[in-house]
Amino acid sequence: MQVQEQVIAFLSANSKALRFLFLFGLIFGVCYFLIGLAPGVRLGIVQPLTAFLASAVTAIINLFGARAWTEGTIVRSSSYSINIAMGCDGIEASSLFLACVLAFPTSWRAKLTGLGIGIPLIQVINLARLVALYYAGVYLPSVVEGLHVYVAQTIVILLSTGLFIFWLERFATEYRRA
Protein backbone atom coordinates (compact mmCIF):
# COMPACT_ATOMS: atom_id res chain seq x y z
CA MET A 1 0.00 0.00 0.00
CA GLN A 2 2.88 2.37 0.61
CA VAL A 3 3.86 2.44 -3.10
CA GLN A 4 0.27 3.12 -4.12
CA GLU A 5 0.08 6.01 -1.66
CA GLN A 6 3.35 7.43 -2.99
CA VAL A 7 2.05 7.24 -6.57
CA ILE A 8 -1.18 8.98 -5.58
CA ALA A 9 0.76 11.65 -3.69
CA PHE A 10 3.04 12.17 -6.70
CA LEU A 11 0.10 12.47 -9.09
CA SER A 12 -1.68 14.90 -6.77
CA ALA A 13 1.39 17.06 -6.24
CA ASN A 14 2.21 17.20 -9.96
CA SER A 15 -1.25 17.21 -11.54
CA LYS A 16 -0.78 20.53 -13.38
CA ALA A 17 2.58 19.53 -14.85
CA LEU A 18 1.27 16.10 -15.82
CA ARG A 19 -1.80 17.69 -17.43
CA PHE A 20 0.48 19.99 -19.45
CA LEU A 21 2.66 17.06 -20.56
CA PHE A 22 -0.37 14.96 -21.51
CA LEU A 23 -1.99 17.78 -23.51
CA PHE A 24 1.34 18.68 -25.12
CA GLY A 25 1.90 15.06 -26.22
CA LEU A 26 -1.65 14.73 -27.50
CA ILE A 27 -1.63 18.01 -29.46
CA PHE A 28 1.84 17.43 -30.89
CA GLY A 29 0.91 13.85 -31.80
CA VAL A 30 -2.19 15.01 -33.68
CA CYS A 31 -0.20 17.74 -35.46
CA TYR A 32 2.56 15.32 -36.40
CA PHE A 33 0.03 12.76 -37.66
CA LEU A 34 -1.76 15.37 -39.77
CA ILE A 35 1.47 16.83 -41.15
CA GLY A 36 3.39 13.63 -41.68
CA LEU A 37 0.81 11.03 -42.49
CA ALA A 38 -2.47 12.56 -43.64
CA PRO A 39 -2.11 12.93 -47.42
CA GLY A 40 -4.83 15.57 -47.72
CA VAL A 41 -3.09 17.88 -45.27
CA ARG A 42 0.31 17.11 -46.77
CA LEU A 43 -0.86 17.88 -50.30
CA GLY A 44 -3.26 20.70 -49.47
CA ILE A 45 -1.29 22.67 -46.89
CA VAL A 46 2.29 21.46 -46.43
CA GLN A 47 3.37 21.21 -50.05
CA PRO A 48 2.03 24.66 -51.01
CA LEU A 49 3.72 26.15 -47.91
CA THR A 50 6.99 24.44 -48.83
CA ALA A 51 6.75 25.70 -52.42
CA PHE A 52 6.09 29.20 -51.05
CA LEU A 53 9.21 28.90 -48.85
CA ALA A 54 11.26 27.88 -51.89
CA SER A 55 9.97 30.93 -53.78
CA ALA A 56 10.75 33.18 -50.81
CA VAL A 57 14.29 31.78 -50.54
CA THR A 58 14.74 32.34 -54.27
CA ALA A 59 13.52 35.93 -54.01
CA ILE A 60 15.85 36.69 -51.11
CA ILE A 61 18.98 35.19 -52.66
CA ASN A 62 18.18 36.88 -55.97
CA LEU A 63 18.30 40.21 -54.13
CA PHE A 64 22.00 39.41 -53.68
CA GLY A 65 22.54 38.53 -57.35
CA ALA A 66 22.21 34.74 -57.23
CA ARG A 67 20.13 34.37 -60.43
CA ALA A 68 18.23 31.46 -58.94
CA TRP A 69 14.91 29.95 -59.93
CA THR A 70 12.36 27.73 -58.25
CA GLU A 71 11.08 24.35 -59.39
CA GLY A 72 8.41 23.31 -56.90
CA THR A 73 10.29 22.92 -53.62
CA ILE A 74 13.74 23.12 -55.22
CA VAL A 75 15.79 26.32 -55.34
CA ARG A 76 18.29 26.13 -58.21
CA SER A 77 21.11 28.31 -59.41
CA SER A 78 24.25 27.71 -61.41
CA SER A 79 26.16 27.63 -58.11
CA TYR A 80 24.07 25.37 -55.88
CA SER A 81 20.63 23.80 -55.42
CA ILE A 82 18.61 22.99 -52.33
CA ASN A 83 15.45 20.95 -51.96
CA ILE A 84 13.19 22.05 -49.13
CA ALA A 85 11.98 18.62 -48.03
CA MET A 86 9.73 17.44 -45.23
CA GLY A 87 11.38 18.45 -41.98
CA CYS A 88 13.03 21.51 -43.54
CA ASP A 89 9.83 23.52 -43.77
CA GLY A 90 9.67 24.75 -40.17
CA ILE A 91 6.40 22.95 -39.57
CA GLU A 92 7.79 20.65 -36.88
CA ALA A 93 9.18 23.59 -34.88
CA SER A 94 5.88 25.42 -35.37
CA SER A 95 3.98 22.32 -34.23
CA LEU A 96 6.10 22.04 -31.09
CA PHE A 97 5.45 25.70 -30.32
CA LEU A 98 1.73 25.31 -31.03
CA ALA A 99 1.49 22.26 -28.75
CA CYS A 100 3.33 24.06 -25.93
CA VAL A 101 1.17 27.16 -26.17
CA LEU A 102 -2.13 25.32 -26.44
CA ALA A 103 -1.27 22.94 -23.59
CA PHE A 104 -0.23 25.69 -21.19
CA PRO A 105 -2.97 26.73 -18.74
CA THR A 106 -3.63 30.35 -19.61
CA SER A 107 -6.32 32.41 -21.33
CA TRP A 108 -7.27 31.97 -24.96
CA ARG A 109 -6.30 35.60 -25.52
CA ALA A 110 -2.72 34.81 -24.45
CA LYS A 111 -2.70 31.61 -26.52
CA LEU A 112 -3.92 33.37 -29.66
CA THR A 113 -1.40 36.17 -29.12
CA GLY A 114 1.39 33.61 -28.79
CA LEU A 115 0.35 31.66 -31.86
CA GLY A 116 -0.26 34.79 -33.93
CA ILE A 117 3.21 36.12 -33.22
CA GLY A 118 5.15 32.91 -32.65
CA ILE A 119 4.32 30.75 -35.64
CA PRO A 120 5.03 33.45 -38.26
CA LEU A 121 8.25 34.33 -36.41
CA ILE A 122 9.34 30.68 -36.43
CA GLN A 123 8.71 30.60 -40.18
CA VAL A 124 10.85 33.74 -40.62
CA ILE A 125 13.61 32.11 -38.56
CA ASN A 126 13.36 29.00 -40.73
CA LEU A 127 13.47 31.13 -43.88
CA ALA A 128 16.70 32.74 -42.64
CA ARG A 129 18.04 29.24 -41.94
CA LEU A 130 17.27 28.13 -45.50
CA VAL A 131 18.94 31.20 -47.01
CA ALA A 132 21.99 30.64 -44.80
CA LEU A 133 22.13 26.97 -45.84
CA TYR A 134 21.99 27.96 -49.50
CA TYR A 135 24.97 30.28 -49.06
CA ALA A 136 26.78 27.66 -46.98
CA GLY A 137 26.31 25.29 -49.91
CA VAL A 138 27.73 27.86 -52.31
CA TYR A 139 30.73 28.94 -50.21
CA LEU A 140 31.32 26.04 -47.78
CA PRO A 141 30.11 22.88 -49.55
CA SER A 142 32.23 20.57 -47.41
CA VAL A 143 30.43 21.59 -44.19
CA VAL A 144 26.90 22.26 -45.42
CA GLU A 145 25.61 18.79 -44.44
CA GLY A 146 26.82 19.17 -40.85
CA LEU A 147 25.45 22.70 -40.68
CA HIS A 148 22.10 21.48 -41.98
CA VAL A 149 21.70 18.39 -39.81
CA TYR A 150 23.24 19.56 -36.54
CA VAL A 151 23.69 23.31 -36.29
CA ALA A 152 20.79 24.86 -38.21
CA GLN A 153 18.10 22.52 -36.89
CA THR A 154 19.36 22.97 -33.35
CA ILE A 155 19.30 26.75 -33.72
CA VAL A 156 15.68 26.73 -34.95
CA ILE A 157 14.56 24.49 -32.07
CA LEU A 158 16.47 26.58 -29.50
CA LEU A 159 15.04 29.84 -30.87
CA SER A 160 11.54 28.30 -30.85
CA THR A 161 12.06 27.23 -27.24
CA GLY A 162 13.31 30.71 -26.38
CA LEU A 163 10.25 32.17 -28.06
CA PHE A 164 8.02 29.91 -25.94
CA ILE A 165 9.82 31.03 -22.77
CA PHE A 166 9.46 34.68 -23.83
CA TRP A 167 5.74 34.10 -24.43
CA LEU A 168 5.41 32.44 -21.01
CA GLU A 169 7.01 35.38 -19.24
CA ARG A 170 5.46 38.18 -21.28
CA PHE A 171 1.97 36.99 -22.19
CA ALA A 172 0.95 33.72 -20.54
CA THR A 173 1.39 34.96 -16.99
CA GLU A 174 -0.25 38.31 -17.81
CA TYR A 175 -3.52 36.69 -18.88
CA ARG A 176 -3.85 33.80 -16.45
CA ARG A 177 -6.95 31.70 -16.56
CA ALA A 178 -9.26 32.32 -13.59
Language model features with spans:
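Hydrophobic N-terminal alpha-helices or hydrophobic patches in metabolic proteins across all domains
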Residues: 1-178
